[in-house]
Amino acid sequence: NRVIGIDRDADALKAASEFLAPFGDRVVFVRDDFRNIREAVEGTGAAPVDGVLLDIGVSSYQLDNAERGFSFRFDSPLDMRMDTRQELTAATLVNTLGEDELERIFREFGEEAFARRIARAIAARRAAKPIETTGELTEIVLFAVPRKFHGGRVHPATKVFQALRIAVNDELESLKQGLAGGMGILKAGGKMAVITFHSLEDRIVKNAFREASTGCVCPPKFPICVCGHKPAARLLTRKAVTASVEELDMNPRARSAKLRAIEML
């Protein structure tokens, strides 16, 4: 048996290849966006496969590495690229997008209640000087968000940073294509499991799995099925699986993780 590891982050592949070196050629690494999972796996000659695991979103390494610019905990270049080969950075978006587009990104990808205020504050600040660091952006967000919302468990900049990261890396579209591609390379009886970390991701996975496991799609008023639609998979998780208390003790960042799984028919 072989494992194919796909990631667009060269640092992640380097760490994984060193950790899994004892397994030799049983592990193959491909530097790519998992939206291209089908082409990547077929390129290794491994398709069809027995299982697919997608671990979505930013990694602890990326969050904890100041140079990558993913976190408001450090004052570092406003980068957020998972694939450092791409040109688009968070600084590019913050300094070039129109105020309305920034508001849309914060609202759509961050579900940020103060999206308009934050976008307006960014536009005002960059008119005087380009916004280049995570510290500068965090300062702007703290200025824009009313002070009474500063004391909660979630930092006021969390949703803005999430939204920019998703936009820079086109994460939701990658997820949609990765789900379709992953199901496309599974053999009958093959299983796919997906771990997500926020509601936007989980909603996409939930809907994709529901669609794949749905049979008849005729209107409810039809007395008999005429569509002939057959389910391609069956749900293995009726509800998302969340981390246990023991898991949270070992890994507090798993508190928002949700796992869903299906089996191809």
Show which residues each predicted segment covers.
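S-adenosyl-L-methionine-dependent methyltransferase catalytic core, i.e., the SAM/SAH-binding region
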Residues: 1-265
